[in-house]
From Swiss-Prot:
SUBUNIT field: Part of the 50S ribosomal subunit.
Keywords: Ribonucleoprotein, Ribosomal protein, RNA-binding, rRNA-binding
Gene label: rplX
Name recorded for this polypeptide: Large ribosomal subunit protein uL24
Record carries keyword Ribosomal protein: yes
Gene3D superfamilies, sorted: 2.30.30.30
One Gene Ontology term of the molecular function aspect: structural constituent of ribosome
Length: 106
């Protein structure tokens, strides 16, 4: 399992699967399983019984995890899906960089 190049809060585009082409923000990253949850992507319906917390019960929609290899980071400067590089600055801090335009990603 490789290192995940995306983290919570990143804007990504889905590159494969039924939701290919959709864009969204990462709600949660799960590094142990190499998966991410992206808002509005891979929405599934869950049937729940009535409980004290939810007396109505019924069907709820929520986002399910997708593999992190199925998303690409969107560069804020060039607005294109890009691979992620790493660079060490003069002061010793490591930053992620856009492979297309070379801009540092926050």
């Amino acid at each position: 399992m490789g290192k995940m190049n995306v983290r919570k809060g990143d804007k990504v585009v889905v590159i494969t699967g039924k939701d290919a082409g959709k864009r969204g923000k990462i709600i949660e990253a799960i590094p142990d399983k190499n998966k991410v949850i992206v808002e509005g992507v891979n929405v599934v319906k869950r049937h729940s019984r009535p409980t004290r917390k939810l007396p109505q019960g019924g069907i709820q929609e929520k986002e399910a995890p997708i593999d992190s290899s199925n998303v690409m980071l969107l560069c804020a400067r060039c607005h294109k899906p890009t691979r992620v590089g790493r660079r060490i600055l003069d002061d010793g801090t490591k930053v992620r960089v856009c492979k297309k335009c070379g801009e540092a990603l926050q």
